[in-house]
Swiss-Prot record:
It catalyses: uridine(2552) in 23S rRNA + S-adenosyl-L-methionine = 2'-O-methyluridine(2552) in 23S rRNA + S-adenosyl-L-homocysteine + H(+). Its EC number is 2.1.1.166. This is Ribosomal RNA large subunit methyltransferase E. The keyword Acetylation does not apply. HAMAP family: RNA_methyltr_E (MF_01547). Pfam families: FtsJ. Keywords: Cytoplasm, Methyltransferase, rRNA processing, S-adenosyl-L-methionine, Transferase. The gene is rlmE. One of its GO terms (molecular function) is rRNA (uridine-2'-O-)-methyltransferase activity. Specifically methylates the uridine in position 2552 of 23S rRNA at the 2'-O position of the ribose in the fully assembled 50S ribosomal subunit.
Length: 207
């Protein structure tokens, strides 16, 4: 195990986080200042729960985190975090209700990653699908001015994805945390200042 991996792995154990990924979110927040007291946060791909715990600490007891993942987790969350086992592509009525009751959200964060096959292009395509779905959910449930954080594995679809992000946010930034493994293809994109969905006029819908 490399020294930098030792450092973040052991640090997570000492600080009672289930995974080292929490430090990626902390770096992103330190750089862009997206998390504040009292905010409502939607965490997609939340298991095992490090990002939810990190967000919950920053937003405090008056804030709320709604966390979802297709996998379950044994992590014990504080009272301001609600975890639901959900498939973001096939959202249940219960999850849709939770989205409505907890949202709209000030921040949507997505650390979703597909099960890897070892085939570069297949893995990139699956990652891209998750990213587009996360963006779709964010666009429906963010407040105007809200922020979006998404993990992307670099590939041929990234340019089109970022182009779509730019239509929805006033600024889009890329960021590679120091706590990411140097050999990892992951990069995080941060959308700042959600503009809201474009209005659809009746004339546009006419033939």
């Amino acid at each position: 195990m490399k020294k930098y991996r030792d450092h973040y792995f052991l640090k997570a154990k000492r600080e009672n986080y289930p995974a080292r990924s929490v430090y990626k979110l902390k770096e992103i927040d330190k750089r862009f200042g997206i998390l504040k007291q009292g905010m409502r946060v939607l965490d997609l791909g939340a298991a095992p729960g490090s990002w939810s715990l990190g967000a919950a600490e920053k937003i405090g007891p008056s804030g709320r985190v709604l966390a979802a993942d297709i996998q379950t987790t044994e992590t014990v969350f504080p009272p301001n975090v609600t975890f639901m086992q959900e498939d973001v592509f096939e959202r249940s009525a219960e999850f849709e209700q939770a989205l409505s009751e907890t949202g709209p959200f000030d921040v949507v964060i997505s650390d979703m990653a597909p099960k890897t096959t070892g085939h570069k292009f297949t893995d990139q395509a699956r990652s891209s699908n998750l990213c587009f779905e996360a963006l779709a959910v964010a666009s429906l449930h963010l407040v105007e001015g809200g922020s979006f954080v998404v993990k992307i594995f670099m590939g041929p679809d990234v340019e089109a994805y970022v182009k779509q992000m730019r239509t929805l946010f006033t600024a889009v930034k890329s960021f590679k945390p120091k706590s990411s493994r140097s050999e990892s293809k992951e990069t995080f994109y941060i959308g700042l200042g959600f503009k809201g969905l474009p209005e659809f006029s009746e004339q546009e819908g006419e033939d």
